[in-house]
Amino acid sequence: MTPFLSVLTSVLAWVAAMLVAASLGVIGPARLRETWSELRDRLWDTRRVVAVLCVVLIASAVGRPSLLDVSRLFGFQATALIYGLEGGFVAWVQATFATSELTAYFSWVYVYGYAFLLSFPAIAYLALPRTVTLRRVLVAYALNYAIGLALYTLVFAHGPRNVMPDMVTPLLFATQPDVMALTSEVNVNSNVFPSLHTSLAVTVATFAVLTREEYPRWTPVAVWLSLSVVVATMYLGIHWLTDVVAGFALAFGSVFLAYRFVDPRENAVGSDDGGEQGRSDPGTGADG
C-alpha cells in the first residue's frame, strides 16, 4: 500500500469510529432513527447548498495549480511583511512548549481531529427537524473555501517552516512523514494566508456555540478541538500567527454571511410546502 493510501485509510477509519461514537453520544439513537425515516426529505432540502459546496471544492481542486502560478507571478508578496510583523513568534512557541507528547497530540489533532471536526456537523445538523442550520453550515464551508482560494491567489506567502528552517521544525512531517503524502494533495507551501484549518475549525466551533441548546454535549468538544487545531497550525510550524488571525476573521465573516444568505423560512422540512404538516418546530433554538 502506498503512503497516501495508508494515511487515507487510517484517517477514514479514525473519523468513522469517532463519528459513530459522537452520533450515539451527542445526537442519540432516538433522533438518529427519526433522521433515517426522514432522510430523503432532508437531503432534498439541502440539495442546492450541497451542489454549491461541491462546485466550490471541485473548482478549488482543479484551479489551484494554475492559480498558484498566478499568485506567484502577480500576487502580493507577503512573506517579508508577515515576518516583519511577528518575527520569530512561531519559533518561540516551538522552543518554549515543544514536547514529544504535545507533538503527538497536535499532529493527531491537525489530521484526524480536524477531519472529524468538519465531518460531524453534517450528521448532527441533518438530525435536526429543520435543515436551516445544516444549510448555513454548508454555505459557511463554501464561503471559507471560495474566499480562501481567492486570498491564496491574491496573497503569496510561505509558512514559517520555509522561512526559518533553522528555527522552526516541521514537527508534523518530522514525526509522521507519511502524512506529507496526504497533505501535499490538498496544500502547497505558499497556501498559508489565511489559515483554512483555523477558519473552518472556528466556523464549526461558532456554530456549536450557536446551537448549544440543541447539542450541549457537542459544544465543549467542538470548542476544544477547534482551539487545538488553531494552536496546532502554529505549534507544528505550518502557519504564522497572522494567518491564524486572518482565519478567525474569515470564519466569523463566513458564519455572518451564511446567516444572511440562508432564509430559515425557505423550503424547510416540515413546512407546508415540504408536505409534512403539523410537525412542531424544535429547530428554532438551533438557529442561534
Residue ranges and their predicted role:
Residues T175-G288:
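Membrane-embedded catalytic cores of phosphoryl/pyrophosphoryl-handling enzymes
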Residues S66-G87, N162-V163:
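Interfacial/capping segments of alpha-helical transmembrane domains
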Residues Y114, L118-F156, W218-A222:
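Interfacial segments of alpha-helical transmembrane regions
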Residues M1-G63, Q77-A80, R212-R217, G253-G288:
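Haloarchaeal acidic low-complexity proteome signature biased toward cell-envelope/secretome components but also
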Residues G25, W108-P129, T198-W218:
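Transmembrane alpha-helical segments in integral membrane proteins
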Residues V93-A115, V186-T198:
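Individual transmembrane alpha-helix segments
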Residues A51-G75, Y141-A157:
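Hydrophobic alpha-helical membrane-insertion segments
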Residues H158-V186:
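Membrane-interface interhelical connector segments
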